[in-house]
Amino acid sequence: MSKLILYHGSPEIIKTPIFGKGKSYNDYGRGFYCTEHLELAKEWACTENTDGYANKYEIDTEGLFVLNLSSDEYTILHWLALLMRYRKFRVSTPIMKRGADWLKEHFLLDLTPYDAVVGYRADDSYFSFARAFVNNEISLTQLAYAMKLGKLGEQFVLKTPAAFEKIQFISYETCDNTVYYAKRKARDDEARAAFRAELERDDLDGLYMMDIIREEVQPNDPRLR
């Protein structure tokens, strides 16, 4: 990783990304969210009946401190703990509260030292899968399966002024919502349908949220790999 081409899907053309803008309750908190995949950026750019833009950038990562959640030292629970920290969600049951608190206590990473974060993007459907796991409804294996259903792709998130200084705008493409919103919706619908089918399968030997709490499972537990 040195120089990367990144794309940002947006209803606007963004020639100069600005540090400090964006929602604090996105997956990894406030930041500038990009992807290395043009087609995904085009999907993210469009809403129903509204076209968008896929902004293209180059970033030089030399000298940046980048957290890659897909590296072997981290597990899906590290990613999930970050979602519990930053995303808004309704805690509807006592087990969900215990699960979210446990994840944040034992798996939450401090993003403060990092200039950028690489990790999964949690569309609404995938966030519902994560909630189901924290609520003890599905096993860790089923959650991992669910995350692969829609080919989420990774996002590259700029978090610090140092990262914003490294990104350079190249160009943009207009994205037709009749094409790309339809693709996004179809991918989401397919993932939800496959997940519903997975829910009908009992994973009797699986590792569930209550097991993790009861057994005090730690990040180095081989069952998390």
Q: Whereabouts are the PLM-identified features?
A:
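Conserved NAD+-utilizing ADP-ribose enzyme module
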Residues: S2, E48-G52, T61-R225
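N-terminal, helix-rich and Lys/Arg-enriched segments in bacterial and organellar proteins
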Residues: Y7, P17-I18, L38-L40, T112-P113, ...
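Extended catalytic/binding region for NAD+/ADP-ribose chemistry, centered on the ART fold
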Residues: K23-E48
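Short, flexible loop/turn elements at secondary-structure junctions
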Residues: P11-E12, L38, T61-G63
